[in-house]
Amino acid sequence: MNIVVLFGGTSPEREISLKSGENIAATLRARGHQVETLDTAVPNFVEQLMQLKPDCVFPALHGADGEDGKIQGLLSILHIPYVGSDVRASVITMDKYLTKLVALQSGIPTPSFIYVYDPHLVPDYWDVERKLGSPFIVKPCDVGSTIGLSLVRSASEYEVALEEAFRFSDRLLLEEFIDGFEVTVGLFRLGGDFLVLPPIYVVKPDRIFDYDTKYKPGGAKHVYDLPISVEARERLTSYSKRICKIVGIGGVARLDYIVKDETPYLLEINSIPGMTAESLVPDEVRHAGRDFGEFLEDLIKDAL
């Protein structure tokens, strides 16, 4: 099969996208597929894509222009089959505010929050503390990999956190900090149903699962022995399937939760999760006893 892997792009997550794309391409080539990689940052990438005439496109793009529905819209216009979620699901999951609204409407717990939609209308620190408690989280509304995220404990830290977050987006989420443990759930669509991969308890050296912890060697441990009850684990599965069905997730997705007192709180949905050799979803696939190459082929079959 002739497959084009789209990677790179211009978002702050470019480095991870390149690694994800190379891992996907190498794995599919090893299984006998004809695979080309194409960086969407090059000016004429659409022309190059059309010249390649792929049977299927495998987007490995993270962040803006990759997970926000734009590339999905382009591929739909060009009538090229592609792996993953459609425009609607991509738009919703890329926007942390919209994701939270869907979660609340679906009966899925999520940390309390304040939506900042205008840089000139930012609430006072003390108002935020009264509503969300201290510490609280400041993060861009539409950037992944915890880029621009800060844990705020004081008014002075709040100013610094706002400046950092506004570097990446003009819309922010101020979010309640729940001091629990982080769990990530991978799932993928196959034959009209969602199959849930083994959840991972992310053991991190600090209170925040930040960029360095996610992607640098030795940053975090992946533990499959979750310190929760069977009932709480079932809620993780139920919540994940429910919201992915409502949103319309396609291909594979990763959902991040914080768990406290047996209650999972949804943080975000990643419609194009990292696919590097060290990423969470490939690890979950291996732990489930599946071959990663076969898994990628299943995603392609679902797209065709």
UniProtKB/Swiss-Prot annotation:
Which pathway does the protein contribute to? Cell wall biogenesis; peptidoglycan biosynthesis
Q: What is its EC number?
A: 6.3.2.4
Superkingdom of this protein's organism: Bacteria
Question: What Pfam families does the annotation carry?
Answer: Dala_Dala_lig_C, Dala_Dala_lig_N
Q: Which UniProt keywords apply?
A: ATP-binding, Cell shape, Cell wall biogenesis/degradation, Cytoplasm, Ligase, Magnesium, Manganese, Metal-binding, Nucleotide-binding, Peptidoglycan synthesis
Q: Primary place of residence?
A: cytoplasm
Binding residues for Mg(2+) 1: 256, 268
Q: Where in the cell is it found?
A: Cytoplasm
Residue limits of the ATP-grasp domain? 100-301
Cofactor binding note from Swiss-Prot or TrEMBL: Binds 2 magnesium or manganese ions per subunit.
Q: At which positions is Mg(2+) 2 bound?
A: 268, 270
Q: Which residues bind ATP?
A: 129-184
Q: Biological process (GO) annotations? A: cell wall organization; peptidoglycan biosynthetic process; regulation of cell shape
- SUPFAM superfamilies noted in UniProt: Glutathione synthetase ATP-binding domain-like (SSF56059), PreATP-grasp domain (SSF52440)
Return one GO MF term: D-alanine-D-alanine ligase activity
| Cofactor(s) essential for the protein | Mg(2+); Mn(2+)
The Gene Ontology CC terms held by the record are:
cytoplasm
According to the record, the segments passing through the membrane are none
Q: Which reaction does it catalyse?
A: 2 D-alanine + ATP = D-alanyl-D-alanine + ADP + phosphate + H(+)
Q: Report the protein's function.
A: Cell wall formation.
**Family as reported in the entry's similarity comment:** Belongs to the D-alanine--D-alanine ligase family.
Q: Identify the HAMAP family for this entry.
A: Dala_Dala_lig
Q: What protein name applies here?
A: D-alanine--D-alanine ligase
Instruction: Please name the source species.
Output: Coprothermobacter proteolyticus (strain ATCC 35245 / DSM 5265 / OCM 4 / BT)
